[in-house]
Amino acid sequence: MFWGALLSMERPTSVRDLCMSLKLSLLDLSLACKFCGNNITNIEKLLFDKAGFQLIWRENNAFGCCQYCARVCSVVEQCFGSHRHLTSEELVNVTKTLQQLSLRCLGCLSILSEADKELCAELNDFSVVRGKTRGLCSLCRLPP
């Protein structure tokens, strides 16, 4: 979608800010996935912001990322990047306290909540992928 009205303004980085800038509701906003080109569903628009992702701008067009492509990106990172297990003790020794860390989910790449980080610490369930520490969020822990 062309966002010509935003040429003179700073480009929004979240779906919410884009809706506010264009004075559109979330339901009326049409947003394509940068990777597959499909339109992102309304639920995926909400999850995009919850995950802490930022809109990608190309030639005055805003793009997001659908859930399927976020998961594929995570799998590709795990397959082609270095990947190792890390205990919570090692993590805190190497970095700061758990609460100060900004961690993403190993499955969907969303930012982990404090509860998710605590569960990962209890289970000693952290991974390092391409130099970045990851754990599983509560949604990715659900059985298929």
From Swiss-Prot:
Renumbered zinc finger spans (unnamed): 33-69, 105-140
The keyword Transcription regulation belongs to this UniProt entry's keyword annotation: yes
Pfam family, one: E6
GO MF entries: DNA binding; zinc ion binding
Keyword Zinc-finger: yes
Domain of life, per lineage: Viruses
Principal cellular location given in the protein's record: host cell
Subcellular location: Host cytoplasm; Host nucleus
Gene Ontology CC terms, in alphabetical order: host cell cytoplasm; host cell nucleus
Record-annotated membrane-spanning stretches: none
Swiss-Prot/TrEMBL GO biological process terms: DNA-templated transcription; regulation of DNA-templated transcription; symbiont-mediated perturbation of host apoptosis; symbiont-mediated perturbation of host ubiquitin-like protein modification; symbiont-mediated suppression of host innate immune response; symbiont-mediated suppression of host type I interferon-mediated signaling pathway
Gene3D superfamilies found in the cross-reference section: E6 early regulatory protein
InterPro entries the UniProt entry points to: E6 (IPR001334), E6_sf (IPR038575)
Entry coiled-coil feature ranges: none
Keywords: Activator, DNA-binding, Early protein, Host cytoplasm, Host nucleus, Host-virus interaction, Inhibition of host innate immune response by virus, Metal-binding, Modulation of host cell apoptosis by virus, Transcription, Transcription regulation, Viral immunoevasion, Zinc, Zinc-finger
Entry-linked HAMAP family: HPV_E6
Family statement drawn from the similarity comment of this UniProt entry: Belongs to the papillomaviridae E6 protein family.
Function, as annotated: Plays a major role in the induction and maintenance of cellular transformation. E6 associates with host UBE3A/E6-AP ubiquitin-protein ligase and modulates its activity. Protects host keratinocytes from apoptosis by mediating the degradation of host BAK1. May also inhibit host immune response.
Assembly information from the UniProt record: Forms homodimers. Interacts with ubiquitin-protein ligase UBE3A/E6-AP; this interaction stimulates UBE3A ubiquitin activity. Interacts with host BAK1.
UniProt name for this protein: Protein E6
Source organism of this protein record: Canine oral papillomavirus (strain Y62)
Lineage, broadest ranks: Viruses, Monodnaviria, Shotokuvirae, Cossaviricota, Papovaviricetes
Gene: E6
